[in-house]
C-alpha cells in the first residue's frame, strides 16, 4: 500500500482465512482484537514454509538448516529493531509475550535496584502485567508502591507528581501508551520527563500501541518498552522487550540455563552478550520469524493508515452506541481513542451480553480485562469491550449494535 493511501479493510479481510466462516449461522464479527488479533495468510503460510524448509535450533550448529533458522530469527530481530526505531539490534530481546518482558524488567532491574525508601509509580489504568510485577517486587524489596489516580478519560492525575517527588525517592515509573480497557492514547512526554528528572527509569507497556500506530522508542524516551506479537497479526508465544543498552548491560539475567552463558565452570558462570544474556533456552524460533512476517504485513499497509482507520471506526461505533438505551460508555472521545470501546448495559451482566451477542456471530470480550484496579475505580466488576483492527468493517459494528438491541429485548 502506498504512503497516504486509505486502508481498504474489505480487501484486507481476504487475507484472513478465519473470516470465511459463519458463527451460529451469522457472519463472524470479530470485535476482540485487543485480546488477540487474527492472522493473515502471509504469516500463516510463511510460518508453515519455514517449518517445512528451514526449521532447526539456532546458534548451536553449522549445518544448513541451522544456518537458515538462525538467519530467520536474527532477520526478524532486525525487523523489530527497525519497526521500533531502536538504535541497536542487540537491545531487542525476544520473550514469550509482553507479560514476560515486563516481569523481566521488574525482576532483573527492580530486584537489583529497589530497596527501602525507594518508590515505584504506576497508574490505576494498568494491565495487571504492568501492575502486579511491580507491586510484588516493590513489596519484596521493601520499596513503596504508589499509584497515580486517573480521570474519566483514563488520563493520570499529574498534580500528584509534586507531592510524590517531595516525599519519595522514585526509581521506576511504569505505565501504558494505549489502555487495553478504555482505549485511551496517552501523551507520555510529561511523565517520561518527570521520571527522568527524578532519576527513575520509565517502563512503557506498548502491547496495545504497537499493532495500531507508529512506535518510535527513541522519540518516546522510555527506558524499557514491551510489546506482544499475537496482538499485531503475529503468532502467540513471541513478544519483545526493548531496553536501553546501558541498562541491559548492567542487569543480571532473568532466567538461567542454556544459550545465555559465556562459560560455565564448577566455581563460576559468566553470561553471554546482549541480547543472548536474556534469552535462556531454545528460542521461539518460528514464532520470531512469524513476527517478522507480521511486521512486513503491517508496514506494507502502513501504520498511519491503520491508526486512521481505527479512529474512524471508533467514531462510528461511539455514535451508534450512544443511542442504545441504558448504555454506559467509558473512556475518551474518538480523537484520543484507539480502536477500543468499553461499555455496560444497565441491569445486564457483561457476560450475559457477550453470550447473547455470540448467538448473533459477534465476538467481544466481557470481564475485567486484566484491569481490576480500573474496574474498582469505575465502580463495576466488569465491562463489555469491543475492539477493532485493520480488518474491521462498519458492518461488524452494525451487527454489534443490532445485537445489543436484541439483548435489551431479552432482558426487557
Predicted ranges, named:
Residues 1-412:
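Pyridoxal 5′-phosphate
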Amino acid at each position: 500500500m502506498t504512503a497516504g493511501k486509505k486502508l481498504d479493510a474489505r480487501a484486507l479481510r481476504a487475507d484472513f482465512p478465519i473470516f470465511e466462516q459463519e458463527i451460529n449461522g451469522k457472519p463472524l464479527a470479530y470485535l476482540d482484537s485487543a485480546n488477540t488479533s487474527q492472522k493473515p495468510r502471509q504469516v500463516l503460510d510463511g510460518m508453515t514454509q519455514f517449518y517445512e524448509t528451514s526449521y532447526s535450533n539456532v546458534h548451536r550448529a553449522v549445518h544448513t538448516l541451522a544456518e537458515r533458522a538462525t538467519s530467520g530469527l536474527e532477520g526478524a530481530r532486525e525487523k523489530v529493531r527497525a519497526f521500533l526505531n531502536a538504535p541497536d539490534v542487540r537491545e531487542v530481546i525476544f520473550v514469550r509475550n509482553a507479560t514476560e518482558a515486563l516481569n523481566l524488567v521488574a525482576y532483573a532491574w527492580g530486584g537489583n535496584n529497589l530497596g527501602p525508601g525507594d518508590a515505584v509509580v504506576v497508574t490505576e489504568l494498568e494491565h495487571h502485567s504492568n501492575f502486579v510485577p511491580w507491586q510484588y517486587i516493590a513489596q519484596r524489596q521493601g520499596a513503596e508502591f504508589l499509584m497515580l489516580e486517573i480521570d474519566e478519560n483514563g488520563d493520570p492525575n499529574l498534580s500528584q507528581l509534586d507531592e510524590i517527588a517531595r516525599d519519595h525517592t522514585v526509581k521506576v515509573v511504569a505505565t501504558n501508551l494505549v489502555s487495553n480497557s478504555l482505549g485511551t492514547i496517552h501523551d507520555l512526554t510529561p511523565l517520561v520527563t518527570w521520571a527522568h528528572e527524578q532519576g527513575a527509569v520509565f517502563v512503557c507497556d506498548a502491547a496495545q500501541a504497537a499493532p495500531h500506530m507508529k512506535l518510535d522508542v527513541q522519540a518516546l524516551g522510555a527506558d524499557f518498552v514491551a510489546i506482544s506479537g499475537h496482538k499485531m497479526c503475529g503468532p502467540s508465544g513471541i513478544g519483545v522487550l526493548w531496553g536501553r543498552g546501558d541498562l541491559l548491560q548492567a542487569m543480571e539475567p532473568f532466567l538461567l540455563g542454556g544459550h545465555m552463558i559465556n562459560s560455565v565452570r564448577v566455581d563460576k558462570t559468566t553470561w553471554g552478550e546482549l541480547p543472548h544474556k536474556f534469552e535462556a533456552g531454545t528460542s521461539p524460533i518460528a514464532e520470531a520469524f512469524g513476527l517478522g512476517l507480521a511486521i512486513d504485513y503491517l508496514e506494507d499497509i502502513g501504520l498511519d493508515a491503520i491508526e486512521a482507520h481505527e479512529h474512524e471506526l471508533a467514531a462510528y461505533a461511539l455514535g451508534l452506541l450512544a443511542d442504545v438505551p441504558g448504555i454506559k460508555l467509558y473512556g475518551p472521545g474518538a480523537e484520543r481513542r484507539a480502536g477500543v470501546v468499553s461499555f455496560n448495559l444497565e441491569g445486564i451482566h457483561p457476560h450475559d451480553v457477550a453470550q447473547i451477542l455470540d448467538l448473533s456471530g459477534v465476538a467481544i470480550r466481557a470481564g475485567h480485562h486484566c484491569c481490576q484496579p480500573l474496574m474498582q475505580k469505575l465502580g463495576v466488576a466488569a465491562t463489555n469491550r469491543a475492539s477493532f483492527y485493520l480488518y474491521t468493517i462498519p458492518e461488524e459494528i452494525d451487527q454489534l449494535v443490532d445485537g445489543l438491541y436484541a439483548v435489551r429485548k431479552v432482558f426487557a
